[in-house]
A protein has these predicted regions:
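Internal alpha-helical transmembrane segments of multipass membrane proteins
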Residues: 1-36, 40, 106-116
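Residue-level signature of catalytic and energy-coupling elements of molecular machines
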Residues: 9, 33, 68, 101, ...
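Short helix-capping/hinge motifs at transmembrane helix termini and TM-loop junctions
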Residues: 16-17, 44-46, 119-121, 154
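Hydrophobic transmembrane alpha-helices and their membrane-interface caps
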Residues: 23-75, 79-82, 133
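Pore- and gate-forming transmembrane helices of large, multi-pass membrane proteins
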Residues: 26, 83-119, 129, 135, ...
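Transmembrane alpha-helix detector for multi-pass membrane proteins
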Residues: 53-73, 100, 104-112, 141-147
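Hydrophobic alpha-helical transmembrane segments of membrane transport and translocation systems
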Residues: 92, 119-166
C-alpha cells in the first residue's frame, strides 16, 4: 500500500508540475521520511502491523502536502523569473516565503499528536509515537531537503537549458 501510494504521488506531482524533477525530489524526500520512521520502529522495537501501515500512509500524506506547498511556490517564482535571475536564490526565496507556514503547521500537528499520545490508550500511543517522529522528519525534509534536491536535479540533470539559467 505504501509503495502504491508513493507511485501514485510520483505520477500526480509529475503531471501537476509538468516536471519529473519535482516528482522525483518529492519521492526521495518521502523515502527519507519513511526510513526515518522505520528506524524509529526498529529502535523502539515496536511491532509492525495494521498500525504501521496506517502510520506510514499518514506520514506520506502529511509530508507530501508540506512538500507541494513549497514546490508550488517555486513554480510561481519560476513563472516570474527573469532571464538573469539566480535559480539558487529563487529556491531559497521560495522556501523562505513558506517557512513560517511550514513551521506553524508542523508544530501544531506535532502538539496535537503529542496530546493524543499523552491522553490515549495503548493502541493510540502505538500510532501517535511514530507519527510524531514522522511529522518531525517530514517537516524537516519538506523544508530542508526537497528544494535543495530539486535545485541539484534542475542544475545537474537539467541539461544545457539549466546550465544557462545558472
Amino acid at each position: 500500500a505504501v509503495i502504491i501510494s508513493a507511485i501514485c504521488m510520483l505520477i500526480y506531482i509529475w503531471f501537476r508540475f509538468k516536471d519529473v524533477r519535482f516528482a522525483s525530489s518529492a519521492v526521495l524526500a518521502l523515502l527519507h521520511d519513511l526510513l526515518f520512521v522505520l528506524t524509529f520502529y526498529a529502535l523502539a522495537r515496536t511491532s509492525v502491523g495494521n498500525t504501521f501501515i496506517a502510520c506510514m500512509l499518514t506520514i506520506l500524506g502529511y509530508s507530501i502536502n508540506a512538500t507541494i506547498v513549497i514546490f508550488d511556490r517555486i513554480r510561481e517564482e519560476l513563472r516570474v523569473m527573469k532571464r538573469n535571475d539566480d535559480l539558487k536564490a529563487l529556491v531559497n526565496r521560495s522556501i523562505t516565503y513558506t517557512l513560517t507556514r511550514s513551521i506553524y503547521t508542523t508544530f501544531t500537528t506535532f502538539v496535537m499528536v503529542a496530546v493524543l499520545y499523552i491522553m490515549g490508550v495503548s493502541s493510540i500511543k502505538e500510532f501517535a509515537a511514530p507519527l510524531m517522529v514522522g511529522i518531525a522528519g517530514g517537516g524537516y525534509s519538506s523544508v530542508c531537503i526537497t528544494g535543495a534536491l530539486w535545485y541539484v536535479m534542475k542544475t545537474k540533470i537539467g541539461g544545457k537549458k539549466a546550465a544557462k539559467k545558472k
